[in-house]
Amino acid sequence: MTTLLIATRNAHKVAEIQAILGTGFACRPLLAEFPAAPIAVEDADTFAGNALKKAESLSHWLAASLQAGGSRDGHLTIGATRTFVLADDSGLEVDALGGAPGVHSARFAAMESGRDGNSPDADNNAKLLRLLATVPREKRTARFRCALALVEFFPSGDGQKEPHLFDGACEGWIDFAPRGKGGFGYDPLFIPTGRDQSFAELGEDVKNGISHRAKALAGLREWFGRSGGK
């Protein structure tokens, strides 16, 4: 069993990653289990840059904290299983908006008021619809992108291997109103190419077979199968 410490507090994201990877992996929310962990400033201009920054900084912090005896939670069994820190940075690119919200997807609405932190999904969706109010169907093309950064975790902090990056994209378009109750983020507005339902309507099984995150995780799973994670 390989343990993946997911660099997020987002329970939806952890559950989605676990569902896509299936057996052989135990996914855990690193930031929820270690509340004192620092949140990396996502100031890179690419999804891959942000994912890499989060994975490396959290891996180093966790090793230092465990050595100091400051963050043991009684559940992380070092040595019994190989453990990796996995960071995901993903978002929506809308062509009519020049690729926005892009790396700012989670804090899209908050940026208008200068607030720090992420915005509620409903606020982000409302802003997106407002900006696209006069844009016709044929120009509402968009895609979800996902970048994953994987770093093997060593409690000693020594011998950290080179990180591995994986990416995926899902093409589609932005609907004129939210549809469906499932998913999270921009899922109620995103209609993937070849479908007539939003991600929020398709259900987890269908979404997890075609999404940007599913494609990135397929690369990760294939890498583990080919290399044994080495």
What are these regions (language model features)?
Residues 2-5, 11-230:
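Anionic-ligand binding patches
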